[in-house]
Amino acid sequence: MNKKRTVDLIHGPILPSLLSFAFPILLSNIFQQLYNTADVLIVGRFLGQESLAAVGATTAIFDLIVGFTLGVGNGMGIVIARYYGARNFIKIKEAVAATWILGALLSIVVMLMGFLGLYPLLQYLDTPAEILSQSYQYISMIVTCVGVSFAYNLFAGLLRSIGDSLAALGFLIFSALVNVVLDLYFITQLHLGVQSAGLATIISQGLSAVLCFYYIRRSVPELLPQLKHFKWDKALYADLLEQGLAMGLMSSIVSIGSVILQSSVNTFGAVIISAQTAARRIMAFVLLPMTTISASMTTFASQNLGAKRPDRIVQGLRIGSRLSISWAVFVCVFLFFSSPVLVSFLASSTDSYLVENGSLYLQISSAFYPILSLLLIYRNCLQGLGQKILPLVSSFIELIGEIAFVVLIIPWAGYKGVILCEPLIWVAMTIQLYFSLFRHPLIKEGKEILATKVPS
C-alpha cells in the first residue's frame, strides 16, 4: 500500500493528520462544485436567464440523486474504514466485492425510478411551463447515467476509507477541467442546448471513475477483491446495505425536503428561481470547509472505532468542532458584505430584484452557520460510530420542518419564509444530535479516559 499517500488517523497528533486528510477532500469538493457552477455560469451567459432557471428548477432533484449515490458510497466506506482500523484486509476485500454488487443493483433501481417519475415530479413541483421542457432535458441526462455517479463515489469512498484522500484529487481536477471545456464546446459550438450541460457532467464523472479504478489497480491492488471474495456473507451485506442506505436515505430525505421547498420557490417565478439558484451555489461553495471537516470526522471516528480508541474520537470531535465554528464565523462576516456582488456575478444579472433577494438569502442563512457547523460534525461523528437511526432522525426533523414551512409559513411570509426555513430547522436538529452523540457510550468512555490522563 502507498504509505506516502495514506494518512494515519489512528496514531500521532490529531490536528495535523486531520488537516492532511481533509485538505484533499476540500479540494475535491471544490472541483466537484465546479461541475455544477460551470453549468450555471455557462448556461446563464450563453443560453440566457430562462435556461438558467431551467437548470435551477432541477437543483433539488439533482441533489436528491447525487446525494443518494454519494451517501451510499460514503456509508459503505464507513464499514470498510472500520475494517481498515482493525487491519483486517481479508474483510476489506470481501466488503469491496459486496459494495460493487450492491452499487450496481442500486444504480439500476434509481435509474428505473427516475425514468418512471421524473416528468411527473417536475410537474408536481410547479416548474413553470416555459422552462419545463428544458428542465426535463437537463435532469433526464443525469438520471440516465446515474451508474456513473455511483461508480465514482464508490471508488472515491474506498480510497478515503483507508485514509487516502489525495489520490482522487488529481483525477477530479482533470475531470472538472474537462467538464468546463465540454460545456463550452457543446453549448457554444455544437449548440446542443441545456441538456448538453448534463452530458458534460456525466462524461466528466465517468473519467473520474475510470481513473480512480486504474489508480487502485496499479497502486493499491491489495484492496481489489479476487473471485473468491465475491461470496455471500449475510452479516456483511446487511451491514454494508444498512450503513449505505442509512446515509443515502439521510441525504435523500434532506433532498426530498429541498424538493418540497423548491416547489414553493418555483411559484415565485423565474427571477426568484434564478436568485435562489445563484445563492445556493454560493452557499455550497462557502460551506465546503465545514462539510469537509465533518466528512473527515466520519472516517476518523470509524477508523478509531475499529482501533478501539474512544479517547481519540473525543479529541478529534473537539478539534473538528473548533475548526468548523471558526470558519463559520468568518463566512458569516464575509457574506454580509459581499453577497450582492457574488449573486450578481453568478446569476449573470444586474436585476435589482434578483440581486436583493439572493443577497438576503445568504446574509440571513449565514448567521446560522456556526450552528450548522456543529450539526454537521455531530451527525458525521455518529455515522462514523456506526449509528444508523439517530442521524436519520435529524433528517426526519428537517423534512417535517420543511413541510410545515411550505404549508403554514411560506404562503403568508413569501420568499422570506423560504429564507428562514432551513436556519430555524438547523437549531432543532443540532439539539437532537447533541444529546444523541454525547449520550453515546463510546463518547462517555472516551471522555472518562481523557479525564484520567495526566496533562503533559
Show the residue positions of the predicted features.
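Short alpha-helical transmembrane segments in multi-pass integral membrane proteins
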Residues: M1-A22, I80-C145, H191-L245, A301-F368, ...
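Residue-level signal for short hydrophobic patches within transmembrane helices
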Residues: H11, L15-L34, A38, I61-F68, ...
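Transmembrane helical elements of multi-pass membrane transporters/channels
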Residues: S20-D39, M141, Y152, S175, ...
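Transmembrane alpha-helix boundary and packing residues in multipass membrane permease domains
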Residues: I25, N29, L41, I78, ...
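Helix-terminus/linker motif at the lipid-water interface of multi-pass membrane proteins
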Residues: I30, L34-A53, L122-A129, Y185-L192, ...
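Small-residue-rich hydrophobic transmembrane alpha-helices
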Residues: L52-L112, S149-A168, Q262, Q276-S339, ...
